[in-house]
């Protein structure tokens, strides 16, 4: 038997795979976006950029930007009754209007 991998990307093939249309798009605009505290964002992981990538469990979660931490942003995400904090690069975040 082969030992099962327990790395940070294990079990995430479907979540971290781009479609043909997504492979053609440029991500430079998403890399340069800026957020201010209080902005609502969705975590949308960009699989081609590994720096500042949040854990794949948080793919699709929404939260509020708490502040900047280095080149990344600290996002408060509600999981049940808890607020968990995810540190993610701006390329892995999308602004939610509203």
Curated annotation (Swiss-Prot):
Pfam families, sorted: Ribosomal_L21e
HAMAP family from the UniProt entry: Ribosomal_eL21
Organism: Thermoplasma volcanium (strain ATCC 51530 / DSM 4299 / JCM 9571 / NBRC 15438 / GSS1)
Family under the similarity heading: Belongs to the eukaryotic ribosomal protein eL21 family.
Protein name in UniProt: Large ribosomal subunit protein eL21
Stretches assigned to coiled coil: none
Source species taxonomy: Archaea, Methanobacteriati, Thermoplasmatota, Thermoplasmata, Thermoplasmatales
The UniProt record lists the keyword Ribosomal protein: yes
Gene name as annotated: rpl21e
UniProt cross-references to PROSITE patterns, sorted A to Z: RIBOSOMAL_L21E (PS01171)
Keywords carried by this UniProt record: Ribonucleoprotein, Ribosomal protein
